Amino acid sequence: MTDINIDSGDKELRKQNNSCSRTRKLYFNTVGALAYRLVMVVSGFILPRFFLVAYGSNINGLVNSISSFLGFIALADLGVSSVVESSFYGPLAKNQRKETSEIWKSSSRFFRVIAIVLLLYVAILCGVYPMIVKSSYSYLYIDLLFLAICIGTFAQYFLGITNSLLLHADQRGYIVYIIDSIAIILNTVISCALIYWGLQIHLVKLVSSIIFLGKPILYQVYVSTHYNLDKNIKFDGEPIKQKWNGFAQHISAVVLDKTDIIVLTVFSTLENVSIYGVYNLVVTGVRDIVQTSASGIQALFGNLLANNEMEKLKDFFAVTEWGIHTATTFVFTIMGILIMPFINVYTRGIHDANYIVPLFAVLITLAQAVRSLKLPYNLMVLAAGHYKQTQTSSFIEAGLNILISIIAVFKLGLVGVAMGTLMGMAYRTFYLAWYLSKNIINRNISNFIKHILIDILSVFVIFFSINWLVYSPNGYIAWIILAIKVSVIGLGVCILLNLIFYRKEMIHLLMYVKKRKKSA
């Protein structure tokens, strides 16, 4: 039973236990999120390969394209989901049942409206999309695929989002991760079986949507069981402060995730969409693992801010920033080295499109690495609720991405859209680092610059250190052996450079690990 259902009790004892509780929840969230992302990555590699072999690049591109167009319904969210999660922090930290119930009720109403908007949006897409996509499939074929895919998205908005946001804000995101992981595993196993048995893509995607229907239902059951919310509460005014101020940040996030495939769908071919999708599943899979390592940190930032524990906040942010920069540099450098050998192995036997595009691989890797570097600064801004103050930069980021992608796609194709993504993400990352230093934790921007310079140095040293390796694996086993060699060398370089430039942080990390072993 969550804290909002417990009487106030002894405040001093609660304060003493609060730090321990936060640390324990952060651990559960981090482990749960990492497990979820690993499940996502494994599923993300298995299913597209089945699609490519069974249905070809055109169908794989069509599925990716439809999913991205449906993803644009998230624009109707208007950024409210981030603001809702931030709004939950204070009432949950202070055990305010009434205020928590009001936010839950207001949010639920809003997202049910979005669910209705989704139905209208899908109806419009069913008429317009077949006219803009370059394919030989009939309108009916495409529209039925749209309907099969959209069912799960509708259920998410109608039942699930508010409950998921409440759990994340209460540092119980691990519940969401457990439910989501089970759904993904079931979907992967059943979808592969259906494809193996030769069923049509429409039925495969329909079964997937039905499986994912269970997620929001289970969220609802858990929240109803563990939270004493007044779901019939009436209130005057809007309980969600700054409700619309997350709009700009939200537009930017949706544009970054969906623009590339939309631009390729309209101005290029489904084969290019399929190629983009294969590379994207690799880079986003790695990015998600890095970002998941920071799962629960926004809620912890929010809790520290709500309790005005600024010194703890600054110390924790410094460690978080160092950890994310180090992890991002290591993981994305290794991925940049291994991505082309992997694509060679992964697409072996697929001859209806050319999946070997090295320059695109470099640019899309850089873009997602920069996006991961943005994570600590973005999480702090969201936790502090500084939506309105940073919204102009969000519009600029989205504008750069769209404008450069559209201009460049005609001559450069996949490389052009990757350039647009990289430029938009780079601008936003540098802006947020500057804003944070000036307005939230008040520190010198040189901290960020130092991290970037050491990141760049690490990349070059790792690349020069592995020049002697052969990069032509002839199968998955050979690729795994290559990956182990590259990873060991890269890890050694990162440890050495961190001992030189971040000795204090490394010592603290070693002491923490030693302490955890003793307490285990």
Please provide the spans of the model-predicted regions:
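Membrane-proximal transmembrane or re-entrant/amphipathic helices at the cytosolic face
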Residues: 1-18, 466-520
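Interhelical loop/hinge segments that connect adjacent transmembrane helices in multipass membrane
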Residues: 2, 6-26, 201-205, 217-258, ...
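Signature of the first transmembrane helix
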Residues: 3-10, 22-90, 119-122, 148, ...
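Membrane-interface junctions at transmembrane-helix termini in multi-pass inner-membrane proteins
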Residues: 23-27, 153-178, 197-202, 223, ...
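Transmembrane helical elements of multi-pass membrane transporters/channels
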Residues: 28-45, 204-219, 223, 234-303, ...
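Membrane-interface helix-loop junctions in multi-pass transport and translocation proteins
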Residues: 52-54, 58-59, 174, 182-216, ...
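Helix-loop junctions and terminal segments of transmembrane helices
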Residues: 78-94, 163, 168, 227, ...
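Interfacial segments at transmembrane-helix termini and the short loops linking adjacent helices
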Residues: 128-149, 336-368
